Design a protein with these regions (language model features):
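Short glycine/proline-enriched turns and hinge-like loops at secondary-structure junctions
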Residues: 74-75, 145-147, 171-175, 189-192, ...
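Short Gly/Pro-enriched turn/cap motifs at secondary-structure boundaries
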Residues: 100, 126, 141-144, 168-171, ...
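A short, Trp-centered hydrophobic/proline-enriched beta-strand micro-motif
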Residues: 129-137, 181
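Flexible, small-/acidic-enriched active-site or ligand-binding loops
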Residues: 148, 201-232
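A short core secondary-structure module
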Residues: 158-159, 163-207
Length: 391
């Protein structure tokens, strides 16, 4: 009996029929809106803003937002997962990163911390794609130690006066609304942090260059500068001094989102490599026939299956509001380190062609490297887990 073509070994049980239909819609959207433009975006270092409005029109933005604001009114991270996975499977993941950040990372702040007036001002545009979002935490010289940030927001009448700089900001060029972590009390560390939304066009708010990265070329990543930028006090998210706590509350979903992209990218790398190794011949036979190739592919397939099962359990836990900070950290570090190992092994099996950017595995290789850094480094993830372990 001939072997069955590989897709996955275990049947996934977390999705229902409506999710499968949604997945097909996302796949069609990517084929129509992304595929014809990706090479240009990859060259330019930024996607067109129309990608967001097209996604909004298709119902792929603000899925969790109330219908009255143009959202889907559905709190179900499985839909977010599908968008994330399909961009990874397509090979166009960098063009989808801004959308997953918009949905998975930024939207929760606008849902849980906003007043009714803020919701009316911002949510319709966020759901339609007319208002693109970003979140700015990292500062030059300050990476994982957020409490040491120096960007300040000092109250002055009905405004905050913001001074400082942020760097490595995803959607930094395209963003209309930037959630900025600031110190409203510079004398305090964690308790001095607050979150404030700074809008495009605010006097004193300037964007630096679109940073040239090793990978994720189609995703704009920028420096942001604030020089006596006057921001209405009405743009404060939540209350003063609660910013760090809100960041901690929302980081598990961000880290799970990164884990989803990591496992999907690893699975797609395996698919590309299976196709290549069965087509490419050496010494009179497909290179997939060699024992070393079989062993490497077997290891990859096994680890991807294991990772996906754990990830699916984390998705179920998130939907049930049960996902812990430690579980999210486990998912984030393990899956992203797996992605790095997988794409490296897959490049090796491609040989010299794996180093050519015309092959998708080469792009997957350079895109993977950042995954163990942003959203919390592997080392920080292990520290979070390690601190929680008690006899």
């Amino acid at each position: 009996m001939a072997p069955v073509p590989y897709d996955r070994c275990m049947r996934r049980t977390i999705f229902a029929e409506e999710h499968d239909l949604f997945r097909q819609s996302v796949r069609t959207f990517i084929e129509r809106e992304v595929a014809p433009n990706f090479e240009r975006w990859d060259h330019d270092g930024i996607v067109d803003r129309t990608l967001f409005t097209a996604a909004g029109g298709a119902g792929f933005l603000g899925i969790e937002a109330p219908e009255q604001f143009g959202g889907g009114g559905v709190k179900d991270f499985r839909y977010n997962t599908i968008i994330n996975e399909e961009f990874a499977y397509s090979g166009f993941a960098p063009s989808g990163l801004g959308i997953t950040l918009h949905n998975d990372v930024c939207l929760p702040y606008f849902l849980s911390l906003t007043t009714e007036d803020q919701k009316q001002r911002w949510l319709p545009g966020i759901c339609s794609g007319e208002l693109i979002t970003a979140i700015a935490m990292t500062e030059p010289g300050i990476g994982s130690d957020l409490a040491s940030m120096s960007t300040s927001a000092i109250r002055d009448g009905d405004d905050y006066v913001v001074n400082g700089a942020k760097t490595f900001i995803t959607n930094g060029i395209n963003a209309d609304l930037v959630i900025v972590a600031v110190k409203t009390d510079p004398k305090e560390r964690h308790k001095g942090m607050s979150l404030i939304v700074i809008e495009r066009g605010t006097p004193g708010f300037e964007r630096g260059r679109n940073l040239e990265k090793v990978g994720l070329h189609a995703q704009d990543t920028a420096e942001l500068f604030f020089t006596d930028a006057r921001v209405p006090a009405a743009n404060l998210l939540g209350s003063e001094g609660t910013g760090f706590a809100h960041l901690v509350d929302n980081l598990p979903q961000e880290r799970l989102s990164i884990g989803v992209s990591a496992v999907a990218a690893a699975r797609q790398a395996l698919r590309w490599t299976l196709e290549y190794t069965h087509d490419r011949t050496a010494f009179g036979q497909p290179i997939a026939n060699f024992q070393n190739s079989r062993f490497v592919l077997a290891e990859i397939a096994t680890e991807v299956e294991i990772a996906e099962v754990f990830l699916d359990r984390c998705i179920e836990a998130l939907n049930a509001n049960e996902l812990t900070v430690e579980e999210a950290a486990m998912a984030k570090w393990w899956t992203t380190e797996l992605q790095k190992r997988v794409v490296d092994s897959c490049v090796q099996l491609h040989g010299g062609y794996g180093y050519m950017l015309e092959y998708p595995i080469a792009r997957a290789y350079i895109d993977a490297r950042i995954q163990t850094i942003y959203g919390g480094t592997t080392e920080i993830m292990k520290e979070i887990i390690g601190r929680s372990l008690r006899p």
